[in-house]
Amino acid sequence: MRVPLIISGPGIKGGSESGTPVSGSDLLPTIMDLAGNKTIALTEVDGGSFASILFNKDNNQVERSVDGIFFHVPYKNGIALKRPHSAIRKGDYKLIKFQDDKSTLLFNLVKDKKEQLNLAT
Protein backbone atom coordinates (compact mmCIF):
# COMPACT_ATOMS: atom_id res chain seq x y z
CA MET A 1 0.00 0.00 0.00
CA ARG A 2 3.00 2.32 0.04
CA VAL A 3 3.86 3.05 -3.57
CA PRO A 4 5.39 6.45 -4.37
CA LEU A 5 3.42 8.80 -6.60
CA ILE A 6 5.38 11.50 -8.41
CA ILE A 7 3.54 14.48 -9.87
CA SER A 8 4.94 17.53 -11.63
CA GLY A 9 3.16 20.50 -13.10
CA PRO A 10 2.55 24.24 -13.08
CA GLY A 11 2.18 25.62 -9.56
CA ILE A 12 3.49 22.47 -7.87
CA LYS A 13 6.62 23.24 -5.88
CA GLY A 14 9.54 21.10 -7.03
CA GLY A 15 10.94 18.74 -4.41
CA SER A 16 7.86 18.96 -2.21
CA GLU A 17 6.61 15.85 -0.42
CA SER A 18 3.44 14.70 1.30
CA GLY A 19 2.84 11.66 3.46
CA THR A 20 -0.90 11.71 2.77
CA PRO A 21 -2.09 8.33 1.47
CA VAL A 22 -3.78 8.42 -1.94
CA SER A 23 -4.91 5.62 -4.24
CA GLY A 24 -5.60 5.06 -7.90
CA SER A 25 -9.27 5.82 -7.26
CA ASP A 26 -8.23 9.39 -6.34
CA LEU A 27 -6.70 10.08 -9.78
CA LEU A 28 -9.93 10.75 -11.72
CA PRO A 29 -11.38 13.19 -9.16
CA THR A 30 -8.00 14.96 -8.93
CA ILE A 31 -7.60 15.32 -12.70
CA MET A 32 -11.19 16.55 -13.02
CA ASP A 33 -10.59 19.04 -10.19
CA LEU A 34 -7.37 20.31 -11.80
CA ALA A 35 -9.22 20.70 -15.11
CA GLY A 36 -11.88 22.79 -13.36
CA ASN A 37 -14.63 20.24 -13.92
CA LYS A 38 -16.97 19.91 -10.94
CA THR A 39 -19.58 17.74 -12.68
CA ILE A 40 -18.66 14.50 -10.89
CA ALA A 41 -20.34 14.33 -7.50
CA LEU A 42 -18.21 12.94 -4.69
CA THR A 43 -20.80 10.21 -4.11
CA GLU A 44 -20.43 8.93 -7.69
CA VAL A 45 -16.82 7.75 -7.33
CA ASP A 46 -14.87 6.00 -4.58
CA GLY A 47 -11.92 8.38 -4.65
CA GLY A 48 -11.45 12.03 -3.84
CA SER A 49 -9.39 14.89 -5.20
CA PHE A 50 -5.96 15.51 -3.73
CA ALA A 51 -5.44 18.65 -5.86
CA SER A 52 -5.43 20.89 -2.80
CA ILE A 53 -2.56 18.84 -1.32
CA LEU A 54 -0.49 19.50 -4.45
CA PHE A 55 -0.69 23.26 -3.94
CA ASN A 56 -1.13 23.60 -0.17
CA LYS A 57 1.35 21.74 2.00
CA ASP A 58 -0.76 22.47 5.10
CA ASN A 59 -3.62 20.37 3.75
CA ASN A 60 -3.22 16.63 4.31
CA GLN A 61 -6.75 15.33 3.79
CA VAL A 62 -8.46 13.75 0.81
CA GLU A 63 -12.23 14.00 1.07
CA ARG A 64 -13.76 10.75 -0.16
CA SER A 65 -17.33 9.42 -0.20
CA VAL A 66 -16.10 6.53 1.98
CA ASP A 67 -13.77 6.79 4.96
CA GLY A 68 -10.51 4.95 4.30
CA ILE A 69 -8.72 3.42 1.33
CA PHE A 70 -9.84 -0.06 0.26
CA PHE A 71 -7.90 -2.70 -1.66
CA HIS A 72 -9.01 -6.10 -2.89
CA VAL A 73 -6.75 -8.74 -4.47
CA PRO A 74 -9.01 -11.72 -5.32
CA TYR A 75 -6.26 -13.87 -6.82
CA LYS A 76 -2.83 -15.28 -6.00
CA ASN A 77 -0.01 -13.13 -7.27
CA GLY A 78 3.75 -13.00 -7.01
CA ILE A 79 3.72 -9.61 -5.34
CA ALA A 80 3.75 -8.80 -1.62
CA LEU A 81 1.31 -11.04 0.26
CA LYS A 82 0.94 -13.64 -2.53
CA ARG A 83 -2.53 -14.70 -1.32
CA PRO A 84 -6.04 -13.43 -2.05
CA HIS A 85 -6.84 -10.69 0.45
CA SER A 86 -8.70 -7.49 1.14
CA ALA A 87 -7.34 -4.50 3.04
CA ILE A 88 -8.44 -1.16 4.39
CA ARG A 89 -6.21 1.72 5.39
CA LYS A 90 -7.83 4.21 7.75
CA GLY A 91 -5.78 6.80 9.60
CA ASP A 92 -2.63 5.24 11.00
CA TYR A 93 -3.91 1.67 10.67
CA LYS A 94 -4.10 -1.02 7.99
CA LEU A 95 -6.32 -4.10 8.37
CA ILE A 96 -5.82 -7.11 6.08
CA LYS A 97 -8.08 -10.16 5.82
CA PHE A 98 -7.09 -13.24 3.84
CA GLN A 99 -9.79 -15.13 1.92
CA ASP A 100 -8.20 -18.58 2.16
CA ASP A 101 -7.98 -19.04 5.94
CA LYS A 102 -9.86 -15.91 7.15
CA SER A 103 -6.79 -14.79 9.13
CA THR A 104 -6.43 -11.10 9.95
CA LEU A 105 -3.49 -8.72 10.24
CA LEU A 106 -3.65 -5.26 11.83
CA PHE A 107 -0.76 -2.79 11.75
CA ASN A 108 -0.11 0.71 13.05
CA LEU A 109 1.71 2.13 10.03
CA VAL A 110 3.14 5.11 11.91
CA LYS A 111 4.79 3.03 14.64
CA ASP A 112 5.47 -0.04 12.48
CA LYS A 113 6.31 0.96 8.89
CA LYS A 114 7.65 -2.51 8.06
CA GLU A 115 4.43 -4.16 9.30
CA GLN A 116 6.15 -6.56 11.68
CA LEU A 117 3.88 -6.30 14.77
CA ASN A 118 0.43 -7.79 14.14
CA LEU A 119 -1.94 -6.04 16.55
CA ALA A 120 -4.72 -8.53 15.73
CA THR A 121 -3.00 -11.34 17.65
What is the predicted function of each stretch?
Residues 119-121:
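Short, intrinsically disordered, charge-balanced linker/junction segments flanking boundaries
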Residues 13, 20, 25-28, 32-109:
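C-terminal cap/loop subdomain of S1 sulfatases and analogous C-terminal strand-loop tails that border
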Residues 112:
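Intrinsically disordered, low-complexity polar regions and short flexible loop motifs
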Residues 1-12, 23:
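Histidine-centered active-site microenvironments of extracellular/periplasmic hydrolases
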